[in-house]
Regions:
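A conserved FAD-binding loop/helix module that cradles the flavin
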Residues: 259-280, 284
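Active-site-proximal substrate-binding core of FAD-dependent oxidoreductases
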Residues: 281-305
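Short, hydrophobic alpha-helical segments
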Residues: 57-60, 94, 277-285
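Flavin (FAD/FMN) cofactor-binding core of flavoprotein oxidoreductases
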Residues: 10-11, 200-246, 297-298
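General small-molecule cofactor/ligand-binding pocket signal
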Residues: 63-67, 91, 219-222, 252
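FAD-binding beta-loop-beta segment adjacent to the flavin cofactor pocket
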Residues: 163-173, 226-253, 257-260
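Mid-domain catalytic core of redox enzymes
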Residues: 68-213, 224
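Active-site/ligand-binding neighborhood in enzyme catalytic cores
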Residues: 1-75, 79-80, 92
Length: 305
């Protein structure tokens, strides 16, 4: 009962489909030290985080191109040619890092023999869905910033109007309502349900756990189904997770589904980016090390590391 929401949320898969190694990694990391158990929750909209990352790139001479989908690439030992939709001539680069989900990568790979090994690995992957339910109430329903809902379909509640305060007119500039986000990982049972059915289910469970919600009026609701949210960490899948290095010397892979040593979490995604960057610098002859060291074990956990 304790580990179910933790493992399903971290791995986005049902317990009977999760590999033992993936589950053990989550348990080991969460118990390694007090710092490892801390949960980070964004205190500002994710768009602001992304914009800050873009500013960082631009400040260092980089350029960001939006709304220009890449249709294909080809490469030799020293150069990559990238074909962008609606542009006649391919763009040329010294190196290419492909940071895409595994199914999107499959459609981008060249129709050459070099693509066969990575395509064979991709064929073993399956997706797992995550559903987010956003509810706006006309009054405060809880003083909690976040909560776990045990033994229910809803796994997590994030009180967004407390975590990211929305300033409104009146009430001394503070929002008088509640905006909450509910998260269901491995949400296979919700994919075929209608938006109305999901909202009704969510309301029933929220009102069960938060009595103040029973008197609140629902102002607005949104349901977001990420059908292909993460890869499924089934037994044996680690053997098919690729490293950043590909059959094309100047082309590298990144993504939470690659061989990071972590499951499909934000930490795993960040690690994949660091590993890809290290591979690029290695190929360029200026090796760099960017991967942050794991937190050291403390207390009794030092006996098991």
């Amino acid at each position: 009962r304790f580990w179910h929401p933790i493992l399903v949320s971290a791995l986005s898969e049902d317990l009977d489909r999760i590999s033992v190694s993936a589950a053990a990694q989550v348990v080991r990391e969460s118990m390694k030290s007090p710092e490892a158990r801390h949960m980070g929750v964004p205190a500002l909209p994710l768009t602001d985080l992304y914009n800050a990352a873009g500013d960082y790139v631009r400040a260092r001479g980089g350029t960001l191109h939006f709304r220009c989908p890449v249709e294909s690439f080809s490469a030799d030992a020293s150069q990559v040619r990238v074909r962008v939709r609606d542009q006649q001539d391919p763009k040329r680069f010294d190196y290419l890092v492909v940071a895409l989900p595994f199914d999107a990568l499959d459609s981008l790979l060249p129709s050459t023999a070099e693509s066969t090994p990575i395509r064979e690995k991709i064929s073993h992957f399956e997706n797992s869905p995550i559903t987010g339910i956003h509810l706006w109430f006309d009054r405060q329903i809880s003083e909690l910033d976040h909560a776990v809902l045990l033994d229910r379909t809803i796994q997590w509640m994030f009180h967004k109007s407390r975590l990211q305060p929305i300033r409104t007119q009146g009430d001394n500039g503070r929002s008088s309502g509640s905006y909450i986000e509910l998260v269901v990982s491995s949400s296979k049972t919700l994919i075929e349900k209608s938006r109305a059915e999901i909202v009704d289910l969510a309301l029933a469970e929220v009102r069960e756990f938060f009595p103040a919600a029973r008197e609140a009026n629902l102002v607005k609701s949104t349901v977001i189904k990420e059908v292909n949210a993460t890869y499924s960490p089934r037994p044996g899948i680690d053997a098919f997770r690729p490293t950043p290095v590909t059959a094309w010397p100047p082309v590298f892979l990144a993504g939470d589904w690659t061989a990071t040593g972590w499951p499909a979490t934000m930490e795993g995604a960040v690690r994949s980016g660091y590993l890809a960057a290290e591979a690029v610098t290695q190929a360029a002859g200026v090796p760099g090390h960017f991967l942050s060291p794991d937190l050291p074990a403390s207390g009794l956990m030092r006996l098991f590391t």
